[in-house]
């Protein structure tokens, strides 16, 4: 009787253990464009955003990486997905000015898209990004001349110090997800993008003067 009880207990334990094992699924991996290639070439230094307190702390670490002539590989774990995103920023010791012509510009301050700064600082929540991307895709002048490929997007991004790191994570997940959704199987560079992390309030910068 005692032996029967022990055997039953073992069977129940094994069954429960097996069920728990079946519930554990490996997290999916989402990689931004060129991430794996740059990692293979040892041009990335990984930052797990779970180890970062806020945006100020993040951009400080990214700047140190930039001064080593490397890019930041940003890792975000959320639910069943690990997001692997390339982040760009400037090295404080480098006075070189970046040249960003022929781009589709997207500006994000905190968790809001800054639209038409000339229009009294009009903003939309980050969830509006899909609509913005669809609008860019629909306009022929946003494409590279004579190619089925959009001009690359330059996303200028800043988050105020008062916001938690979860704000940064949310925005980066949205960017990665929305751009991944428009990638074509036969044209992976259809709409490439770069995220430029800056340390100033983008929404307060006046727009460029209109052409004469």
What is each of the regions a protein language model found here?
Residues 3-10:
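Sec-dependent signal peptide recognition
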Residues 15-18:
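C-terminal motif of bacterial Sec signal peptides marking the signal peptidase cleavage site
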Residues 20-212:
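Long, low-hydrophobicity, acidic/polar, solvent-exposed interaction domains
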């Amino acid at each position: 009787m005692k032996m029967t009880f022990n055997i039953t207990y073992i069977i129940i334990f094994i069954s429960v253990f097996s069920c728990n094992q079946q519930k554990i699924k490996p997290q999916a991996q989402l990689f931004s464009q060129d991430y794996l290639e740059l990692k293979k070439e040892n041009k990335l230094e990984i930052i797990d955003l779970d180890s970062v307190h806020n945006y100020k702390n993040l951009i400080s670490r990214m700047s140190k990486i930039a001064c080593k002539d490397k890019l930041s590989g940003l890792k975000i774990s959320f639910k069943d997905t690990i997001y692997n995103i390339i982040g760009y920023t400037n090295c404080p010791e480098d006075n070189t000015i970046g040249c960003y012509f022929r781009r589709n510009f997207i500006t994000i301050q905190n968790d809001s898209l800054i639209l038409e700064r000339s229009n009294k600082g009009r903003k939309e929540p980050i969830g509006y990004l899909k609509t913005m991307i669809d609008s860019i895709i629909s306009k022929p002048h946003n494409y590279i001349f004579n190619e089925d490929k959009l001009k690359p997007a330059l996303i200028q991004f800043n988050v105020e110090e008062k916001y938690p790191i979860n704000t940064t994570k949310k925005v980066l997940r949205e960017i990665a997800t929305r751009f991944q959704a428009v990638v074509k199987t036969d044209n992976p560079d259809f709409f490439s993008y770069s995220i430029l992390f800056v340390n100033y309030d983008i929404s307060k910068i006046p727009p460029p003067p209109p052409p004469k």
